Amino acid sequence: MAVARAGVLGVQWLQRASRNVMPLGARTASHMTKDMFPGPYPRTPEERAAAAKKYNMRVEDYEPYPDDGMGYGDYPKLPDRSQHERDPWYSWDQPGLRLNWGEPMHWHLDMYNRNRVDTSPTPLSWHVMCMQLFGFLAFMIFMCWVGDVYPVYQPVGPKQYPYNNLYLERGGDPSKEPERVVHYEI
């Protein structure tokens, strides 16, 4: 019984000692603060103005996500554009994300960052690209059909075999001398 009591006291002493060595704030240093979370959905113009100021936006540009129960709160609804569309030569505070300090990030930034979806406009419209692709495929199918209907072969001579045209292999009599086959003329 005394050994068990000593073991419990030892564990309690170790827990108290480790609390004094490690700062208590180290555990929560990586968590998001209360100011980083979206607030409640703005209902009045004053709440909209306060939310726009919170996200460093003008009141005219601020548009929150609809209050449909998804938990967006007062977070601004930014355009669905990828980071590719932002100026690469601008001096960004975070060049990897092409963001400045204090600028609100898109709610789905993990989808619209530079190594994922690129929403940049394409140089050609979709129907032109589809016409080019399907036109090329139709041309290749047509050419394969033409090659199948009108085959082209390299001109070849009759097959030549060594050892007097394989006389013994084709069942010739080994006691007789086969007739000499000449494959060339000089």
Swiss-Prot record:
Please give the GO cellular component terms listed in this UniProt entry.
mitochondrial inner membrane; respiratory chain complex I
Q: Which GO terms describe its biological process?
A: mitochondrial electron transport, NADH to ubiquinone
Pfam family, any one: NDUF_B8
Membrane topology field: Single-pass membrane protein
Cysteines joined through disulfide linkages: none
Keyword Thylakoid assigned to the entry: answer is no
Transmembrane portions of the chain: 133-153
The identity of this protein, by name, is NADH dehydrogenase [ubiquinone] 1 beta subcomplex subunit 8, mitochondrial
Write down the species. Pan troglodytes
Q: What lineage is this protein's organism placed in? A: Eukaryota, Metazoa, Chordata, Craniata, Vertebrata
